[in-house]
Amino acid sequence: MIAENKDYVKPDVNTLPAVLPAVAIRDVVMFPGMSLPLSVSRSKSIAAINLALDSNKYVVAVAQKEAEVEDPKAEDIYRFGVLSEITQSLKMPDGSIKVFLQGIARVKIEHLDFNNIANSWFASVFYPADEKVSGPEVTALMRQLLDEFEEYATVSRRIAVEGVSFFRQIEDPSRLADTIASNIIVKTSDRQDVLEAVNPKDRLELLIKILANEVEIISLEEKIHSKVRAQIEKNQKEYYLNEQMKAIQKELSQKDDFQKEIDELRSKIKKNGLPKNAKESAEKELDRLAKMAPFSPESTVSRTYLDWLVNMPWNSSTNDILDLKKAKEVMDADHYGLDKPKERILEYLAVSKLTNSLKGPILCFAGPPGVGKTSLAKSIASAVGRKFVRMSLGGVRDESEIRGHRRTYIGSMPGRIIQGISKAKSNNPVFLLDEIDKMGSDWRGDPAAALLELLDPEQNKDFSDHYLDVPFDVSKVMFITTANSLSSIPVTLRDRLEIIDFSGYTEYEKEAIAQNHLIPRQMKEHGLKEGSLEIGLPAVKLIMRDYVREAGVRNFEREISTICRKAAKMYVENCGKTVTVTKDNLHDFLGVPRYTNFTTEENGVGISTGLAWTSVGGETLSIEASEISDGKGRIMLTGKLGDVMKESVHAALTYARSKGYGKGIDFNKTDFHIHFPEGAVPKDGPSAGTAVTTALISLLTKNPVKKNLAMTGEVTITGRVLPIGGVKEKFMAAYREGVKTILYPHTNEKDVSEVPEVIRKQLKLIPVKHMDEIVKIAFEKGEPKSSFKKSKTAPKKESAKKAAKSKKPAVKKPAVKKTKQVKKTAKKKK
């Protein structure tokens, strides 16, 4: 019950202003004397409240005609309101304001204008005179109103009957009418009519009619409930809701909405062309629904299931754009390079055009972040004219995310595959399964195992979702998955994917992407018109070398965005003068360079440069070796190394010792420390074997490694150089760091063709089969001397000289040894 505030002192309306801020309120009509708590969240209403708080705390509270209108116009607001004072206000964290309004007097709004500057409505108001009425007729009306109100309180059970005694103490007819009107639950329009009734006598008569009508409606509702209760005594309780609906329909002559809904579902089952098994399941469920109570929990579950089943795009598909030229133009407009995936899509379209029927391919775009895997999938959907659906698999650990929940569970839903296809309203969309390598598994199941059926061309024609419980054909869907690393994808799942590698961009490709895509896009986003910002090509190259180190262009674009923000500020401050970015003033925009090319410039004794590959692209790897005399023959390894790399270091030292390097060193009393800088970064793999071996030989022979030389390859204890992976990424990283010469395994020559020609021309690429070849090339002072060669060759040469001087037959035997030794030495050198 809303009561008036007796402690409030009503101001004199003659002293109040004629123009006040106005607040449009929904679902409630304010009355004089009424105290109303109100939560204000709309911007125009907040502005009006703030204006009132800053001045005299008075606002006009006026109801809007339709509560659903979020941004009402002048015609949506009534022309009678209540002058109200803000007695309390509280600003909430979400920006809204909670206020308490105290109604003061009726006002008639003569003009309602919106002020764009203040973002608020302003009302020019007229204060109608509060007429004083009395006499027997008024007294009779007041008594009749109180009787009707008491009956209303009795039948509605919304107001305690004892509380009616409070209203009988009110002697002023105007105040009585306003107080009762603020405490009954009726339509907003009826309340507004009471507010607009300026004469208290008219107001009393109107309220009597409203209350009498409301009492009649409530009595009719009670009568319907009584009939239903009588029927329940004769029939089973499970038909309670059905009988209630029949009683309501009999009284109000309304159509059976539940039966209408069943008829609509039956019509959809016939029209939507469901497959035989799906149609049988839908009809069976519909028959069950028809026997249920309309508002029972079971009927809600059944209706939801039928909605999913009949609204699935069983036969709805989009027509592919089979124009190869147009498809290529669409993909080229959005992405520079990426020839392999584009070529694969064009091949699919060509075959589809020739056969008129083809299963959707299941592709996997594998590569480092920021190279355009996800965005290319969107372009493919646009190029082939299909709907696009994206599902992120990162962090997914529940099998039900893929295959849905069974309907026996509360709140069960289809899996996200079926949800995505239903949302697309097409059975052949381009469906992107993003970050497939980031899935996990726990007690809820393994999502990767659930994907086996989905991504198998031989099985996905009958993909079974636990919720639908009928097979759905997803063979027409073009599935595209993305991954940064293939190693974390289960072998059985990887076997079902057609892998397309996305290697990092070259500097030349990044330059083209920056000039044609990144810079224009960032300028547009930051409001910079053409000609307001100029970024020179040398500055673009410097950004790539000194500020970003990545295979893709995500951080590259972020740096360009930083330049655009600072350029926008300078452009505004300099009154529209063009901002030019050069390599000389680049640090003013981006600060101190984050990276320096130091790796290949510091090679010396015990230092070599290797090449590594990670999921985010290629990297150069500096390797340092040091010896500690008076030790215990230990090998110390630092740099957060994996087991494979540790074993590679041991193999390298074994090879170096077997070749006799390290004359005069007592290996039993010397410790060797091998360090890989950037110790916080985990490192593993055998491909640094050649670089580790070279660093150890350099240390043992005190022969420095050549500058601007890097190498990669696995080494065995006999010195054979074995093949490695990530050739393209490693070579691109070496080129970026200023390396001039690269030694790589001979068996990887076939992979060199994948390296862009513009990079191959600027690098000296030397394939090697054995560590002996690397030893001849890698050192500043030439090939290091082996202690074994010296100890074995000198005595044999001396015996050969003695044999040459002697003519005795007995000396011929060493001469034969000389010949064999010469042949053996020649063979070894070869």
Curated annotation (Swiss-Prot):
One of its GO terms (biological process) is protein quality control for misfolded or incompletely synthesized proteins. Keywords: ATP-binding, Cytoplasm, Hydrolase, Nucleotide-binding, Protease, Serine protease, Stress response. GO terms for molecular function: ATP binding; ATP hydrolysis activity; ATP-dependent peptidase activity; sequence-specific DNA binding; serine-type endopeptidase activity. SUPFAM superfamilies: P-loop containing nucleoside triphosphate hydrolases, PUA domain-like, Ribosomal protein S5 domain 2-like. It catalyses: Hydrolysis of proteins in presence of ATP. Signal peptide: none annotated. ATP binds at residues 367-374. Pfam families: AAA (PF00004), Lon_C (PF05362), Lon_lid (PF22667), LON_substr_bdg (PF02190). Residues 20-215 form the Lon N-terminal domain. Induction: By heat shock. The keyword Ligase does not apply. SMART domains: AAA, LON. The active site is at 687, 730. Disulfide bonds: none annotated. It is found in: Cytoplasm. Its EC number is 3.4.21.53. InterPro entries: AAA+_ATPase (IPR003593), ATPase_AAA_core (IPR003959), Lon_bac (IPR027543), Lon_bac/euk-typ (IPR004815), Lon_lid (IPR054594), Lon_proteolytic (IPR008269), Lon_Prtase (IPR027065), Lon_prtase_N (IPR003111). Residues 784-830 are annotated as: Disordered. Belongs to the peptidase S16 family. ATP-dependent serine protease that mediates the selective degradation of mutant and abnormal proteins as well as certain short-lived regulatory proteins. Required for cellular homeostasis and for survival from DNA damage and developmental changes induced by stress. Degrades polypeptides processively to yield small peptide fragments that are 5 to 10 amino acids long. Binds to DNA in a double-stranded, site-specific manner. Homohexamer. Organized in a ring with a central cavity. This is Lon protease. The gene is lon.
